[in-house]
Amino acid sequence: SDQGFFLGEHGWFDKRFMYEECQRMPLIIRYPKAIKAGSTSNAISMNVDFAPTFLDFAGVDIPSDIQGASLKPILVNEGKTPADWRKAAYYHYYEYPAEHSVKRHYGIRTQDFKLIHFYNDIDEWEMYDMKADPREMNNVFGKPEYAKVQKELMELLQDTQKQYKDTDPDEKEKVL
C-alpha cells in the first residue's frame, strides 16, 4: 500500500513528513497456514520489520544486525502485542535540500504521543498528544502540562536513535 500525497493537510503537498497522513498506512498479510483471518493489531510496526518477518515465517535465521523485528509473534497470536514489543516507531528524513523541499527531521511515535525534531538549518520541535489531537494541529512541545511526558519522549528518542545507530543526524549531511 502507498499512503499517497498530502492534499493540503498541514499546508503541505508531499509525503516525506512524520505526520499521520504520511506515516500511517495499512499492512495486510494473508497466510492462512499461520494467521487467523480477520486478525487486527495496533502494534507499532515499521517497514524494517518486513524482512525479519518474512525470514521468520520461512524458518530462516534472522541476522543479529538487522534493524527490524519479526511481526510473527503478533501475527500468529491474533494481533496481541507481546509485552516486550517496541514502545515507539522511529523515523528520520535527511534528504534536504532536494526537489521536495522537506526539512530534515527525525522523531518517534508512541501509541499516545509523537515527538519530531526539525534540524540542520533550523531547530524546531513539535510534540503531539495523539489521543487528544489525532490530526496534529496543536503543538504541545514546551507546554508545562506536558513536561513529564516530553522528558520521557526525549529519553526514548535518544535510546531509539542508539538502537538504530542513528545518533548523529548531522553526519547525514556529510554523506550527502
Which ranges hold each PLM region?
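Histidine-centered active-site microenvironments of extracellular/periplasmic hydrolases
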Residues: 1-39, 46, 99
